[in-house]
Regions:
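Alpha-helical nucleic-acid-binding subdomain
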Residues: 1-160, 166-175, 191
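Conserved helicase motor core of SF1/SF2 NTP-dependent helicases
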Residues: 126, 146-159, 166-348, 352-373
Length: 373
């Protein structure tokens, strides 16, 4: 839903903020914040436990000097263990006293609210603060949480595969490397990034950051030769070799009655999976309100699983990772698809098709479709 709003009504400032948060410079600044600035939120005071007094200077020395290379939670744990040792409590009460000491130490933090701490960082970067945590901020919030409290669960596995890697930021990958210490494989297509433009330079920088090897998969198996070549013409470059599987030519219609044309195509393909792939939910609702046929179509939703339905509608975003026998892309107008991110959206939508692909425009066709002729 957030991406749907961004695609339909995102401002230039929205996209600039995303570009900043998906940059390696942002990651370096954030790592510096995690390793230095965030630690300064700890303001120790002299602690008294019965007859035992632990001076502020001693706590400060342990935290800021002796353990300065550790994350906050490990410093707090070490100081709490030190207090338990000094107090010489019976073993049966060690855990309770240790937890009490930890709680008192965390109370010496100016704040442990991860969003509030993240906003401190954003202010220092002269970026807008957040009120709600979005996909563009969740990795940073979790990294702050990990620094403060550690992870309370072992998430490791024998092998991890992460798909759609183009949708993740350098901060996400930094988080992944902290969570999983096993071998990992990241898969994706930089041309299917729908909220930012990526390049091979980005991949090289990412590989260097996470110490990974890049392997290019240069053969397309999903679509027919006709669809694959057409999709690559939308991009204006060749990105893969095609498997020798022929099919129908991609079809384009310019008509004022978009609904009627969709219904006609659907009627001719009742035994195949058909998906009407729209730019936004607004378009889906517009079509369903105008057609009793389309009103019966299942709408793909990221929050629910797909059924066995053969007739579907989806936004381009929710169609990612899914394939259909027949794809229909309505409102393929220039006013609807005109910038570089729109180009990527059209590419993503067209690559959902296995056998047949249809574009329908009711105004001047998109410039990216005109270039394919």
């Amino acid at each position: 839903r957030m991406l749907d709003r961004l695609i339909t009504s995102g401002t230039q400032k929205d996209f600039e903020n995303i570009a900043i948060k998906y940059s390696f410079e942002f990651l370096e600044d954030f790592k510096n914040f995690l390793n230095n600035d965030i630690c300064n939120l700890f303001m120790p005071k002299t602690m008294v436990f019965g007859n035992l007094i632990i001076e502020e200077a001693e706590i400060r020395d342990i935290y800021y000097n002796k353990l300065k290379n550790l994350p906050i939670y490990k410093r707090i744990e070490a100081i709490a263990e030190h207090i338990v040792d000094l107090f010489n409590v019976p073993p049966s009460k060690n855990i309770d006293f240790y937890n009490r000491a930890k709680k008192l130490l965390y109370n010496k933090m100016i704040t442990t609210d991860c969003v509030r701490i993240y906003n401190i960082f954003l202010r220092s970067m002269e970026l807008d603060e957040i009120e709600e945590v979005s996909a563009y901020d969740i990795a940073q919030i979790l990294l702050i949480k990990e620094n403060l409290f550690g992870f309370d669960h072992n998430y490791d596995a024998k092998y991890i595969v992460v798909d759609e890697m183009q949708d993740y930021s350098p901060c996400h990958f930094y988080l992944f490397e902290k969570i999983w210490h096993c071998p990992k494989m990241y898969l994706g297509d930089i041309n299917q990034s729908i909220d930012k433009n990526l390049s091979k330079d980005y991949l090289n920088m990412l590989a260097k950051e996470i110490k990974a090897k890049i392997c290019y998969l240069n053969k397309s198996y999903r679509s027919t030769i006709q669809i694959s070549k057409f999709s690559q013409k939308i991009l204006g470059k060749k990105v893969a070799n095609n498997v020798n599987r022929n099919g129908e030519e991609v079809k384009f219609y310019n008509t004022k009655d978009v609904v009627k044309k969709i219904e006609k195509i659907v009627k001719a393909h009742t035994n195949q999976t058909v998906c009407v792939v729209c730019k936004s939910m607004k378009e889906i609702k517009l079509l369903q309100n105008a057609s009793s046929v389309l009103k019966t179509f299942e709408v793909l939703d990221e929050e629910k699983e797909m059924t066995e339905s053969k007739m579907l509608m989806s936004t381009i975003i929710n169609s990612k990772g899914v394939e259909f026998d027949v794809v229909i892309i309505p409102f393929a107008n220039d006013e609807n698809y005109h910038n570089e991110l729109d180009r990527n959206l059209l590419y993503v939508a067209s690559t959902r098709a296995l056998h047949e692909l249809y574009f329908i425009a009711d105004k001047k066709p998109s410039r990216f479709l005109m270039k394919t002729k």
